[in-house]
Structure formats: structure tokens, C-alpha cells
A protein has these predicted regions:
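Transmembrane alpha-helices and adjacent helix-loop boundaries
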Residues: 1-298
Length: 298
């Protein structure tokens, strides 16, 4: 039971990093990026490919961060000529193109079978020692990610992003480059998601095309809605809640006679019911976004 608990919390910490990066876009800036899993996949496959060719695990993370930092602004630049809803569809298409590329490219990405046997940073440890080391690392990375995102959102940069979300025309009239700001936030959020993807791959020692399905992005949106979209603390707690739901659903077979092939569908159903309940009763999530009030005196 201890092993399972350590696994659940570690995965939750990894997804918290993923959720924080999406919160910068969807929560703070109002950018609906339906293909955010692409950045997660870039980090994951970068670590996998580097490890496959005998490279250091840290180098794999750096490669993923670098590629995501370049891809993010390129995707953001597409918003210059596209409306927000069309841009969201384009991001989904880009993520699907990436998934199809890694599915059909066998030399580097392993094709449909993916890349297995990836060596992580704690390969010399065994048992609970390895699990605890991974937990500490992922919690530290999630904590640093939280501090970075919280600092950014409290700075003038964050205030500009919220202005873009609420009043884009006003932001433009004040001289802010809307496309430039979108490119900047994607240049920050993309690498954060890539770090989460790298940690995920190094932790489970495997990455395949199924980890890049669109449902992964929408699962993180669920985390944000449950935790509180626009709130970094909510993003982290939302990741924990969803992972606990995922983990707890595995024990349903001990109480209810559920066919093994239906287990994954039941898991999605439970998450969907919880999401619906939050949208109906507490749409602001567990931690509502707190906006600072500024008193204007004449």
C-alpha cells in the first residue's frame, strides 16, 4: 500500500507541473490551448530519445525545454491571424500531427510501441528508497514550478496577461502587443509542460503515442476546473484530486462486479461526474482566483 501511495502522489506532482503550465495559458491569459499535450510530449520524447542513445537524463530534459521554448512562440504567432476558437482548434491539430509523427517514425521514437527501458536519475536505488527519492524530486519540481508561476502572475507580466483575458481591446489600446504577449506566455508555459513530460517518462521508464492523446489535455483542463482555474494553488490541488479519483477507482472492483475491460471507462465516468458536480455547484473550483482590488481616489 505504501508503494501505491507513493506512486499516486508522485504522479500527482508531475501532473501538477503540467497543470501549472496550462493554467498560465487558459487560466491567467485566457488562451484555450487544446493541444497543450504537445509540449508534454516533446519533453517526454526528448528524454526518451536522448536516453535511447546513451545520453544523460538531464540532457534530455534540457533538450525538451529548448525545443518547447522554440515551438511555443511559433504556435503563439499563429494567433496573429486566427480568432481564439480557431487557434484552439489549430493547437489540437498540431498536437495530433505530433502524435502521428511519433507513431509512424520507428527509428527515433519507436513507432506505436514507443520507447521503453528509459533510465532515470535514481536507477541505482531500489524499493522504497527509489520511490521516496522520486517523490521528493517531483515535489521539489512542482514546488519550484508553483513559485515561478505565482511570481509571474503577481508581476506586471501577470497583470498584462489578465488584461488580455478580460479586455483584449483595452490592452491593445494601451500599447500592448497581443500577439507578442501570447508568444511570451507560450515560451514560458511550454518548457514547464516539457519538464513535466520529461519527469513522467523518466519515472515510468516508458513513453508511447498513447500518452499524447487529446484526452490528456482535457484531463488537465478538468484539474484546473476542479482546483480553480486561474489559481496556481488550485491547479496543484486539482491535479491531486483527479489522480486520487483515478487511483481510487481501481478499488471499485473490490466492491462492485466490474468487467476488467470496463475499468478505464468507469474511471473516466467518475471523473466526468465529479467535474459536472463542480460545474453545477462550485464553478469557481476549490480555490477561486483572487483578484487584487485597487482603490482609485480622486
Amino acid at each position: 500500500m505504501l508503494d501505491f501511495s507513493l506512486y499516486v502522489v508522485t504522479i500527482a506532482a508531475i501532473y501538477a507541473v503540467f497543470a501549472l503550465s496550462l493554467n498560465l495559458q487558459a487560466g491567467v491569459t485566457g488562451l484555450l490551448n487544446f493541444g497543450h499535450v504537445a509540449f508534454f510530449g516533446i519533453g517526454a520524447y526528448s528524454s526518451g530519445i536522448v536516453a535511447l542513445h546513451g545520453g544523460n537524463w538531464l540532457l534530455g530534459i534540457l533538450v525538451g525545454v529548448g525545443v518547447s521554448a522554440l515551438l511555443g512562440p511559433a504556435i503563439g504567432r499563429l494567433g496573429r491571424t486566427l480568432a481564439a476558437d480557431y487557434w484552439a482548434i489549430v493547437t489540437l491539430a498540431i498536437a495530433e500531427c505530433l502524435r502521428l509523427v511519433v507513431s509512424n517514425q520507428t527509428d527515433w521514437t519507436g513507432g506505436p510501441q514507443g520507447i521503453s527501458g528509459i533510465v532515470g536519475p535514481f536507477a541505482t536505488l531500489t524499493g522504497n528508497a527509489q520511490a521516496i527519492a522520486w517523490l521528493v524530486l517531483c515535489l521539489v519540481v512542482a514546488g519550484v514550478g508553483y513559485l515561478v508561476c505565482e511570481t509571474l502572475t503577481r508581476m506586471q507580466f501577470g497583470r498584462v496577461l489578465r488584461l488580455l483575458r478580460e479586455e483584449p481591446m483595452l490592452a491593445a489600446s494601451l500599447g500592448h502587443n497581443i500577439t507578442g504577449e501570447k508568444m511570451r506566455v507560450l515560451a514560458v508555459a511550454g518548457p514547464i509542460a516539457a519538464i513535466g513530460g520529461s519527469l513522467y517518462t523518466l519515472y515510468i521508464s516508458y513513453i508511447g503515442p498513447n500518452q499524447l492523446l487529446p484526452i490528456e489535455t482535457f484531463l488537465v483542463f478538468t484539474m484546473l476546473i476542479i482546483g480553480g482555474i486561474g489559481n496556481n494553488r488550485g491547479a496543484m490541488f486539482g491535479a491531486l484530486v483527479v489522480q486520487l479519483l483515478y487511483a481510487g477507482s481501481r478499488f471499485l472492483k473490490d466492491w462492485v462486479d466490474i468487467p476488467a475491460q470496463s475499468a478505464s471507462s468507469i474511471r473516466i465516468l467518475i471523473v466526468g461526474l465529479v467535474l459536472t458536480a463542480f460545474l453545477m455547484t462550485r464553478p469557481e473550483g476549490l480555490f477561486a482566483e483572487k483578484l487584487r482590488r485597487i482603490d482609485v481616489r480622486h
